[in-house]
Amino acid sequence: MSLCLISAGVTKTLAVAAFTLVWTHSIEKIDWRENWRVTPQGLELVEARVKGSGAGMEPPPEARLVDGWFVWQPHRVPMPEVVLGNSGKAGEWRLCTKGTCRTLSTILGHDVGPHPTTMRACD
């Protein structure tokens, strides 16, 4: 399995089984991170963490504080695809694998700008 990213008619395939999606909240200006796994059933959200709370980003009651991050395991079924929007007010989505993070624009080879990006598991 691989991860496919699709935006503005461009598709990139990344040979990864797991990745971290990172973004900066547009109002609070703090990072939110999600660990994902690519499975035959779709994209599975394994863990979420945030460095603070407020402005609609409160961690759930089961979150625990670990090294300054609120961490929890969302309980969701794998999703066939995830669509990422871009407000333009908080910088870009970043995708991290093997300790390296890159913006979606860098990965896709064009300025993502206002275009949504679809993530899905692919062969």
Language-model-derived ranges and their functions:
Residues 4, 8-60:
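N-terminal secretory signal peptides
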